[in-house]
């Protein structure tokens, strides 16, 4: 990692923070705000992390690196080769054909020879490792961060979690948040669909303890590979070798039968008693909401080893945009060829960062026959991690660039009709809070591949329309119409919820189809109708398609408000991840925050719109 830091410094992508800052909130808050600056801000190296313990201050001799992945330039520096080149290599590998002549044969031999790098190579441990075992183990000696005020504690957020199947035939590298309970216990938040969880059940059935090792740092590409959506049974370090063009060099662990890369900065080893679960959380997650307290497995740590000059790598997740935007971009590009294997008419796809990946995907396809888009929808919802996507919109090959926001929205609105909207049900991300049931909920697929026959509405200005609708639905506060020149304008309405569900009250507006097409209801207290970026983030987070959509002849009503018992939603509704104003003021006093008010208004850093406008 030291070499990567030198590279960042050379290219002006690194900011060094020498001011002592607390591992509880201060470091994470500063990194969170930095990531929202234009072009992702800088990578931040905190040289003096501290922790206040009663009347004393604990200093850590280990710097903390954050926002390391947080720009396209830093991605390029990390990869050392163009993303397009990696994508082409992946495509060539997946579409391997027998050579037709001698020249093609030589190329095939070269490609096959390059695959020798995919298998990790065993090596010995570095001799200068500092090793702590048994009673010497103390996780509290690491600068593990508490990132959000309501978090259940400190969490390791960029740990490479190494596991293997009971018969040692399958290996997995994943990334899961890891809660520090005490000196030698970590909570393992691996969800029901993760490979590690499948291995866990094997060990539980056999009634033996499961070995788990966690590595931090080293080549940052290990960390990205831990997030890669590979098919079950394919080891992520093989992907590392494919991308790097060299074998991952792995060393044996001291306490268990696993191996981890020998250049990692920190290694935590131990075992999981599969018969014991502990409450884990809450945690402010990448959805921008806190996930609730739930039981998860616990790692009993037997060994911690680290380099003398080790660096602690961490991230902060929450409301977008953050560095996972760039990590997700690499995933998009590299795995497009793999997705095309299951959906061969797929041309391109895009996961907007304010759709927080699984909540929204746009896809461009070659449409060849009636209902083709619906066929691809089902293909998406049946493939790996794509099965967790809640909302998918499909456009034809003549559509604009998927990243040209205004152009693609106008295209979709011209082609949208309720007849071409498919509402289904299936598995969803375990972090999704809007679904009525855990890990299962509604899905919405929109076929916008051809022109709609929906007639254009008779437009009213915002003031006239507001007065008309308030007469029939008294809890409406404000509204704003987007893209009024299209066939399906979007009318966003802020409401104050009382004792009835919004979807029930929306039936009072069915008589105004002449003026309405797509109507989206949001909470007045937490939304700025003039901020479409944050509106989209809240909308796709807060809806379950089967429960929260009402349709009529030409209208499509969507309830994106917070849900409760009145909405027949009986799960706990979470709060948003908001920065602590006390911490923000402390960072300001230390001269570390600039342009905070602008970023706060744009990305709702501290609290929702209706409150923050009073403080700015």
Swiss-Prot record:
It comes from the Bacteria. GO terms for cellular component: cytoplasm; cytosol. One of its GO terms (biological process) is ubiquinone biosynthetic process. One of its GO terms (molecular function) is 3-octaprenyl-4-hydroxybenzoate carboxy-lyase activity. This is Uncharacterized protein HP_0396. Belongs to the UbiD family. It comes from Helicobacter pylori (strain ATCC 700392 / 26695) (Campylobacter pylori). PANTHER family: 3-OCTAPRENYL-4-HYDROXYBENZOATE CARBOXY-LYASE-RELATED, FERULIC ACID DECARBOXYLASE 1.
């Amino acid at each position: 990692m030291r070499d990567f830091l030198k590279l960042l410094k050379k290219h002006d992508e690194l900011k060094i923070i020498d001011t002592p800052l607390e591992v509880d909130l201060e470091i994470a808050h500063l990194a969170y705000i930095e990531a929202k600056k234009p072009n992702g801000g800088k990578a931040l190296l905190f040289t003096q992390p501290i922790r206040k313990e009663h009347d004393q201050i604990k200093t850590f001799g280990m710097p903390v690196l954050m926002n390391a992945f947080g720009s396209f330039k830093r991605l390029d520096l990390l990869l050392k080769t163009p993303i397009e080149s990696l994508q082409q290599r992946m495509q060539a590998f997946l579409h391997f054909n027998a050579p037709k002549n001698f020249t093609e044969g030589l190329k095939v031999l070269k490609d096959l020879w390059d695959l020798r790098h995919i298998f990790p190579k065993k090596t010995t441990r570095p001799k200068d490792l500092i090793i702590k075992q048994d009673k010497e183990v103390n996780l509290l000696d690491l600068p593990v961060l508490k990132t959000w005020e309501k978090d259940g504690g400190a969490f390791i957020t960029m740990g490479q979690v190494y596991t293997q199947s009971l018969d040692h035939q399958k290996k997995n590298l994943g990334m899961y948040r890891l809660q520090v309970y005490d000196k030698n216990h970590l909570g393992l938040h691996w969800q029901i669909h993760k490979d590690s969880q499948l291995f866990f059940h094997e060990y539980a059935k056999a009634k033996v303890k499961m070995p788990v090792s966690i590595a931090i740092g080293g080549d940052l590409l290990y960390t990205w590979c831990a997030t890669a959506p590979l098919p079950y049974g394919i080891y992520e370090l093989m992907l590392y070798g494919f991308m790097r063009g060299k074998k991952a060099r792995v060393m044996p662990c001291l306490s268990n039968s696993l191996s981890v890369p020998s250049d990692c900065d920190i290694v935590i080893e131990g075992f999981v008693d599969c018969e014991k679960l502990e409450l884990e959380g809450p945690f402010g997650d990448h959805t921008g909401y806190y996930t609730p307290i739930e039981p998860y497995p616990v790692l009993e740590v037997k060994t911690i080893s680290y380099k003398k000059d080790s660096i602690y790598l961490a991230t902060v997740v929450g409301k977008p945009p953050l560095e996972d935007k760039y990590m997700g971009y690499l995933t998009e590009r590299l795995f497009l060829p793999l997705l095309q294997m299951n959906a061969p008419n797929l041309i391109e796809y895009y996961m907007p960062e304010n759709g927080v990946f699984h909540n929204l995907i746009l896809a461009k396809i070659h449409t060849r026959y009636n209902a083709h888009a619906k066929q691809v929808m089902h293909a998406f919802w049946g493939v790996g991690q794509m099965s967790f996507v809640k909302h998918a919109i499909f456009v034809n090959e003549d559509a604009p660039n998927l990243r040209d926001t205004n152009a693609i929205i106008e295209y979709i609105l011209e082609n949208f009709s309720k007849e071409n909207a498919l509402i289904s049900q299936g598995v969803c991300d375990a972090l999704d809070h809007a679904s009525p049931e855990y890990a299962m909920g509604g899905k919405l697929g929109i076929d916008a591949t051809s022109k709609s026959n929906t007639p254009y509405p008779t437009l009213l200005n915002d003031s006239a329309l507001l007065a008309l609708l308030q007469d029939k639905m008294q809890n409406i506060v404000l509204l704003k119409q987007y893209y009024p020149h299209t066939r399906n304008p979007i009318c966003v309405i802020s409401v104050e919820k009382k004792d009835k569900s919004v979807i029930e009250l929306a039936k009072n507006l069915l008589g105004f189809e002449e003026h309405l097409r797509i109507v989206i209801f949001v909470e007045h207290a937490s939304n700025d109708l003039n901020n479409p970026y944050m509106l989209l983030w809240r909308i796709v987070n807060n809806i379950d398609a089967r429960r929260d959509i009402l349709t009529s002849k030409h209208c499509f009503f969507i309830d994106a408000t917070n849900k409760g018992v009145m909405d027949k939603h009986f799960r706990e509704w979470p709060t948003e991840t908001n920065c602590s104003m006390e911490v923000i003021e402390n960072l300001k006093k230390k001269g570390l925050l600039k342009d905070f008010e602008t970023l706060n208004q744009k990305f709702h850093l501290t609290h929702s719109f209706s409150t923050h406008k009073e403080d700015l």
